A protein has these predicted regions:
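Short amphipathic alpha-helical segments
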Residues: 28-35, 40-56, 62-69, 73, ...
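A short, aliphatic-rich beta-strand micro-motif
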Residues: 124, 159-167
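Short beta-strand-to-loop transition segments that serve as allosteric relay/switch motifs
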Residues: 174-184
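Short hydrophobic/glycine-rich mini-motifs in sensory/regulatory modules
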Residues: 164-176, 189
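Signal-transmission linkers at sensory-effector interfaces
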Residues: 1-45, 49, 56, 173, ...
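Allosteric cytosolic regulatory segments
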Residues: 193-201
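Short loop/turn segments at beta-alpha junctions that line or gate ligand-sensing/allosteric surfaces
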Residues: 114-122, 131-149, 159
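GAF sensory/regulatory domain recognition
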Residues: 52, 64-116
């Protein structure tokens, strides 16, 4: 079992289940996704494109993107993580979600559910935002202390968690995470890093544009 910050790993490539893309196909799909992201005209379009593209993979159960934002007192007061939160000044807000249950076919696209907000340091997602470190857990178990929904992990057969911080010039802007029903190798983390880097630049540019407009008013 591996539960660690992402790092280069060596070894034989695991057997590929039927329908799973080869590493070469994966890289080609990643490049194609980056080109499509460049054509998007808004952050929401980019987020939806990324989440839907990853969730369309046979092995992916859920793909999500959270943004790190300043919080408001009214939001904190009603947040289910209020008493676990270490910093009531900012938290992660779910900005994109796509996935499908293998149990009943339910599609996970809602942005206001149980995990629509994460406090810094809570679970793997919150830890990634707090530390700015990518995490690759390739033997996920429901009883792991960072798992916030053990029943979901068990029922959906989640085997791997891949999480990348969205970092621009040393500043964490959010978290990009994928929950897979198959074991993923280090190359999968590399591909996620490429997408995460583009996401971070897009977010930073959008924030800079918003700040410029605010100063002009």
């Amino acid at each position: 079992m591996h539960d660690h910050p992402a790092s280069p790993r060596t070894g034989a490539t695991p057997d590929l289940p039927a329908g799973t893309p080869t590493p070469e196909q994966d890289m080609g799909q990643t490049r194609a996704l980056l080109l499509e992201m460049a054509r998007c005209q808004s952050l929401d379009q980019i987020f939806r494109l990324v989440a839907e593209t990853f969730a369309a993979r046979q092995d992916v159960a859920l793909c999500r993107i959270w943004l790190l934002e300043q919080t408001e007192p009214s939001l904190c007061a009603s947040c289910r993580h209020f008493y676990d939160c270490r910093d009531h000044r900012q938290c992660l807000r779910l900005a994109a979600s796509t996935g499908r249950s293998r149990m009943d076919g339910h599609v996970w696209t809602a942005l206001d559910g149980e995990h629509s907000r994460f406090s810094l340091g809570l679970g793997k997602v919150g830890l990634i935002a707090q530390s700015g470190t990518a995490y690759h857990v390739d033997d996920v178990r429901p009883d792991m202390d960072w798992v916030t929904s053990p029943d979901w992990i068990r029922q959906e057969g989640i085997r791997t968690f891949l999480g990348q911080p969205l970092v621009h010039r040393g500043r964490v802007l959010g978290v990009f995470a994928v929950f897979s029903r198959e074991v993923q190798d280090a190359q999968a983390m590399d591909r996620l890093r490429m997408i995460a880097d583009y996401l971070a630049v897009s977010i930073a540019n959008a924030q800079a544009f918003e700040e410029l407009n605010r100063l002009k008013r």
